[in-house]
Amino acid sequence: LPFIDNKTTMAADSSSTVMELLKLLQDRSDLTLLTNSAEAIHVLAQSEIKVVSTGGELNKNTLSLQGRITKEIISRYHVDIMVMSCKGLDINSGALDSNEAEAEIKKTMIRQATEVALLVDHSKFDRKAFVQLADFSHINYIITDKSPGAEWIAFCKDNNIQLVW
């Protein structure tokens, strides 16, 4: 995973896609993770990763911590990279999500990160969702499972986004 090999601090959202990445990293004793994911906190409790919880109110549907306290805690930290997923990607609108509370937490994490990586499967490209999460000027990497097509490849190249599939 070259995009995170030299990173020592990371923020992660509560998406199932990012959870799969975190499982691959659990032997990294040099990594500190800031997350609002109750699942990540639980799963990584026995790992080598140093886990920092954001605190906040638990959303039982998403198993994520949310609210004012969560945003305040995130704002106290700075991370090398923030990894997140989203519900859709639109060339004109950017990264989109379906839950406003989740989007606010992710936006706070983005502000506290040097770099941002989007982990999305191929179905998210050219897909709209309810809430604007981030425009592409905030995204450094898009990691996906299949080639998204010529238009997206050119768009990422033109916007200095490293596209990995």
PLM feature spans:
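Conserved phosphate- and dinucleotide-binding cores of soluble alpha/beta proteins
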Residues: 39-165
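Short beta-strand scaffold positions
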Residues: 12-13, 35, 144
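Short N-terminal secondary-structure initiator segments
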Residues: 22-35, 161-165
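HTH-adjacent hinge/linker in prokaryotic transcriptional regulators
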Residues: 1-16, 22-30, 45-49
